[in-house]
Amino acid sequence: MYQNLIYEVTAGVARITLNRPQVHNALSPALIREITEAVTAAAADASVRVLLLTGTGDKAFCSGADLKAGLGEATSMGDALRTRYNPMITALRTIPKPVVCRLNGLAAGAGCSLALACDVIIMAADAYLSLLFVGIGLMPDAGATFFLPRLVGSARAFELASTGRRVYGPEAAQIGLVQRVVATTELDAAVEDTLTYYRHAPTRAIGAMKQALNRSLYSDLETMLNQEADGQEALGETLDAGEGIMAFLQKRKPDYEGR
């Protein structure tokens, strides 16, 4: 079904592995389309509790747009963003399930944007992020201008975007670009720990949190108070909420089913 990525679902985890190692997992039009389709499939699959996004190999998560593959396209850059990149980023931000990025290597250009669109980024210490758009006379896209200032503030966002410099793991964690940085040898274990947590978490509650937090970025207090009330009312009717409350009263660990 997929030619440019590997999609697997096991034990509540949907794993998307970008699989174009010969070009450092660069984003061709076909790969972008497949990522969007895979995220949509994970959203529709009730057995999926958490989504993992990573790249094949140990050198690159994603090196950004495949410029050679795009040369044969008649589509303008703006149309390419509107019809391909933007739907991919929107799918990641709106799936009502947590998205974990295993940042195993370089994440450059739109590859950096792709990583920043995830809910949790676990990064190898020797990997790096770079918004290298400026190096070819372009501005950051694929959501980077939205995510970056909200993560690190406007002044630092401008510095990173206007220089395109590399931000390695330790600095990325220090300035808030990523949530966790570990040694390369510990990356898989750290990722699996995080996946284990989320696949046993109350999935619908996590999805409601994600939706509310997304909306809070461009909303006001009154709107968010109403959003919280509506969300809590719906969650109060779920099986997971019933299980969570009962487990609390019985002083035991809850057994969530994602329902």
Where are the regions a protein language model picked out?
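Conserved CoA-thioester-binding segment of acyl-CoA-metabolizing enzymes
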Residues: 1-54, 90, 188
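Short, charged, surface-exposed hinge/linker loops at domain edges
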Residues: 210-219
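Terminal low-complexity tails and localization/encapsulation signals of metabolic enzymes
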Residues: 1-2, 246-259
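Crotonase-fold acyl-CoA enzyme core
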Residues: 90-206, 230, 234-238, 242-246, ...
